[in-house]
Design a protein with these regions (language model features):
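Active-site catalytic motif of lipid deacylating hydrolases and related acyltransferases
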Residues: 2-70, 107-125, 206-211, 228
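Short alpha-helix in the alpha/beta-hydrolase fold that links the catalytic acid
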Residues: 18, 188-197
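Gly/Ala-rich beta-loop-alpha elbow adjacent to hydrolase catalytic centers
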Residues: 76-80, 84
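Flexible "cap/lid" loop of the alpha/beta hydrolase fold
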Residues: 89-127, 164
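Active-site nucleophile elbow and catalytic-triad environment of alpha/beta-hydrolase enzymes
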Residues: 149-168
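Short beta-strand/loop motif that positions the catalytic acidic residue
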Residues: 178-180
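Catalytic histidine-centered segment of alpha/beta-hydrolase-like enzymes
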Residues: 209-219
């Protein structure tokens, strides 16, 4: 079984290398994605213009790993959770339904239009936003922090172009697994009931922590993913 990982805003695939170190019983191959970004002036890579383009690129990446031959699952943290969800929705249309889509530190996609305004201007005071989220290396030097901020701002602007649709009958994902921290400043519990609009089956796990709770509880998160895949 294959697991595909989509990172948070400003993040990279290597931020989730701990998945590759864990001894899963039911997952054989793990792939972590890097969003196409123009990281250097001389780079020929072009920045993605909108969220839809990000999803399309992610779909191409997943399809390049031959998912027709065996079951697979998708994992996304924060912004990456929306990417994983949309990738799963699109692949389901083509008969390639993921076993589950694991969404970490994110609201139900269909609720995003209701909270869009809260996200549109987050990058104006990016230092305050980073402080609220937590999980950032306090020892990061100024150059590295400025680089991270530039990526985070770019990704937040891209998130502003995300317009999810409410799935019609037969379009919902078969299964979503939800992980979150109980003190996450960008989650809205009043909309959690809308997970039922996104998937026929949802299982939710909550930890004591903030947006990046996963780094504190990664062993337990991966254990629960393995158990869920097994059906336990």
């Amino acid at each position: 079984m294959k697991l595909f990982i989509f990172p948070h805003s400003g993040g990279f695939g290597h931020n989730y290398n701990f998945f590759k170190k864990y001894q899963f019983e039911n997952i054989d191959e793990i792939y972590a994605y890097d969003y196409p970004r123009k990281l250097r002036p001389e780079s020929k890579v072009k920045d993605e213009r909108n969220f839809l383009e990000r999803v399309r690129n992610a779909i191409e990446w997943v399809l390049s790993h031959d998912i027709k031959s065996e079951e697979y699952l998708l994992f996304g943290h924060s912004l990456g959770a929306f990417v994983a969800y949309e990738v799963g929705m699109e692949l389901k249309k083509h008969g390639l339904n993921p076993l589950t889509v694991i969404m970490s530190s994110q609201n139900p996609p269909v609720s995003f239009p209701k909270v869009r305004k809260d996200f549109e201007n987050l990058y104006i005071d990016i230092d305050y936003f980073i402080e609220r989220l937590g999980g950032t290396n306090c020892n990061m030097n100024k150059k590295s922090m400025d680089f991270y901020k530039s990526l985070l701002i770019s990704d937040l602007k891209l998130l502003g172009t995300y317009y999810p649709k409410i799935p019609q009958k037969g379009e919902k994902l078969d299964d979503i697994t939800i992980f979150c921290g109980d003190d996450d400043p960008v989650l809205y519990p009043e909309y959690w009931g809308e997970w039922d609009l996104c998937s026929s089956s949802c299982e939710k796990f909550t930890y004591h922590g903030t947006h990046f709770y996963i780094y504190q509880y990664k062993e337990d998160v991966m254990k629960k993913i393995d158990q869920h895949v097994k059906g336990g």
